[in-house]
Amino acid sequence: MEKITMKEKIDVQKPDDLGLDISDLRYFLVMLLFSAVVFFLLISQRLTNTFDGLWNNTWFFGGYWQVVTGRWLWPVIDALRFGIQTEPFNSLLTLSMSALAVTLLRKFFTEKDSVVTYLAGMAVLASTVTEIQLSYRFQSPVFGCSFLFSVLAAERVVRAADFRKAVVQGALLLVMSLACYQTSLDNFCLLLLTYLLLLLFRNVDREKVHAYIGRSLCSAAAGMVLYFLLTKLIVWACGWQMASYNGGADVSVLSILKNLPNAIAETYQLFGAYFFQNYYRHNILQPVGFFVLVFLALSIGLLNRFRKMLHRKNWEYILLGVAALIVLPIMCNAIMLITSEAV
């Protein structure tokens, strides 16, 4: 039997199939157990942040504020879990959804688990982002849902059988993600961009790359437009008005275009501040230049990939790859293009 190359693996992926098996269940359980151990102290001691995470009652239902800030799926999710927000139920529910999202996420980039895939998943789940979400105990499951929906949306764009299904399914899941928490748009955009880089590096057929770019752009545009229209409709049907929180009430096509140059510049500033400064404290290794070393290692790997592309003299893929790397900081902060107040 002929050996199947990495390029061919992409070509023969089954469409419309999540492809979950016993290895995925094992990975999910390991991720869930690991994250529960990491955050055991926070969960067992019922620790919360000093802002709106201080909730002592045992139940909570979202309502007016969640809807007028564009998070209209929040009350639905609260109702589905009967408003329960006691520990450890809420935190384990959140960690379960995050672990499932990471389980699906890794399948974008590999068909076989290794030490690297486990360490990568653990790094995502053990991040300060997860800790902050858990500290808002009454709303942490909504964060988990938003993360999971954003990964599922990107997964549908990649694996759906045809263009129409990819756009429709991806857009609907993106709407659900945004209706929980808008900043998950960043997850969706970054996943699609990194998968594009993977296709380019693996030298996948040009037609498939073009089709993938079309799927990605159309699903993202359709999802954001549909979310905007549904949000306006739901708020109007409730007899309310959009809140000015994070500039949400002023968002329009004109405002986005008008603020686009400043928003793009701010995405690069945030990217640099997050990884190369101590403004955002999220890793004890930051002061010793940990991320500089990580970026150097990644840069060596990327340069090697581009060297192979140069050897093939595939100038279109080289240009697409360079463009993807240039816009990567923008995709990491895509929500900033909508409203620059969403920091």
Which residues are covered by each model-predicted region?
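Membrane-interface transmembrane helices that cradle and orient dolichyl/undecaprenyl
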Residues: 150-167, 201-206
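Extracytoplasmic catalytic/substrate-binding loops of multi-pass membrane glycan-assembly enzymes
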Residues: 38-58, 65-77, 181
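Hydrophobic, aromatic-rich transmembrane alpha-helices
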Residues: 102-103, 272, 281-316
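Membrane-interface alpha helices of multi-pass inner-membrane proteins
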Residues: 166-182, 187, 193
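Perimembrane helix-loop-helix junctions
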Residues: 188-221
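Short hydrophobic/aromatic helix or loop-helix immediately within or flanking a transmembrane segment
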Residues: 64-88, 92-97
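Membrane-interface micro-motifs in multi-pass membrane enzymes
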Residues: 67, 71, 94-97, 115-158, ...
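Membrane-lumen/periplasm interface segments of specific transmembrane helices
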Residues: 38-39, 43, 213-291
